[in-house]
Design a protein with these regions (language model features):
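N-terminal export leaders
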Residues: 33-38, 143
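Basic/polar N-terminal segments that are highly enriched at the extreme N-terminus
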Residues: 55-56, 300
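The N-terminal extracellular segments of secreted preproproteins, especially immediately downstream
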Residues: 8, 47, 73-76
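Bacterial N-terminal signal peptides
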Residues: 40-52
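Short, conserved sequence motifs used for protein processing/export or organelle targeting and
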Residues: 114-142, 146-300
């Protein structure tokens, strides 16, 4: 049993009424259907707000990848963004290292506020999960844990169960080394070396590198979150496939990822993960914080 405390550490939940959200849900369902993200009509949404605080951090050897699909245009997302920040900072799961990624989708951008961190590629990534996990629809805020467990980001019991499941799954070794930034800020590149040891296990998996902002903040001027200052953690700027692991094989290779213009090396983290094709299961993950140009701080 994972020692995640969702009791006295849980701050009072803030649930918006069904009446207040009904018009929003209907509009979002129509929007998602038009964009091909709603697989089945008539499926309801659970998008309730909550604020969660978790227990104290603990040393953790097992990496768990936690992806949050979110948007600054969604009024149910700020509490989930806050939860992700707490998971990252407090590391409340003994025996685990939570590696978080905030992935901003773009299907809310037509609803009054364009999220500056949104990406159609990340929308497509969420859509792939809808297919792989047999879901009816994409929605926000949604958590994906280790690529094969999906849950509403406002349900602490589901979050706890997902971490319990993830801790039972063995991971293969992965390492990020010699991570450095090169070039001017307006056209910087991150380079490093990635090694994956699949050992004797059979795998058919893709290897990804994600570059994410450690911290981001926005003043929202329109839309459902109008007037709010929103903060985020590990906001994905780039996510690229750099290789693959097949059958009983290892991977050892240098990688290179071009950063978005203006991205400062001291403001990002580099995340590497190995994801099985078909099932989406994440079998390896690692992260490096980049506190200053040319200096990688290993394994967060």
């Amino acid at each position: 049993m994972v020692g995640v405390i969702f009791g006295e550490w849980l701050l009072p939940s803030v649930f918006s009424s069904i009446h207040d959200h009904r018009h929003r849900v209907v509009r979002l369902k129509r929007m998602l259907k038009q964009r091909g993200l709603l697989a089945t009509s008539g499926v309801g949404f659970m998008m309730c707000s909550f604020v969660a605080g978790l227990g104290q951090s603990a040393a953790a050897p097992t990496p768990i990848l936690v992806e949050l699909f979110t948007s600054e245009g969604c009024s149910s997302c700020p509490p989930a963004d806050a939860l992700l920040q707490k998971l990252d900072a407090l590391q409340p799961v003994p025996g685990a290292r939570l590696i978080v990624l905030s992935e901003h989708v773009d299907y809310w951008d037509q609803e009054g506020w364009k999220d500056q961190y949104s990406s159609h590629e990340l929308t497509n990534r969420q859509k792939s999960y809808v297919s792989e996990l047999g879901l009816a629809t994409a929605y926000t805020p949604q958590l994906i844990v280790d690529g094969n467990v999906e849950l509403h980001a406002n349900d602490p019991q589901q979050v706890q169960s997902a971490f319990e499941k993830a801790l039972k799954d063995a991971k293969i070794p992965i390492s990020l080394d010699s991570v450095n930034f090169e070039g001017p800020e307006e056209a910087a590149t991150v380079r490093g070396h990635l090694q994956v040891d699949a050992g004797s296990e059979n795998h058919n998996a893709d290897i990804y590198i994600a570059v994410a902002l450690n911290h981001a903040e926005s003043q929202v001027l329109r839309g459902e979150n109008q007037g709010q200052t929103l903060t985020h953690v590990a906001v994905v700027q780039e996510m690229v496939k750099v290789g693959k692991v097949q059958k009983k094989g290892n991977f050892s290779q240098d990688f290179e990822v071009k950063l978005k213009p203006g991205t400062k090396p001291g403001e990002v983290r580099i995340v590497a993960f190995v994801q099985e094709r078909g099932s989406g299961k994440v079998v390896a993950a690692a992260s490096v914080l980049q506190n200053q140009p040319g200096t990688g701080i290993a394994s967060r």
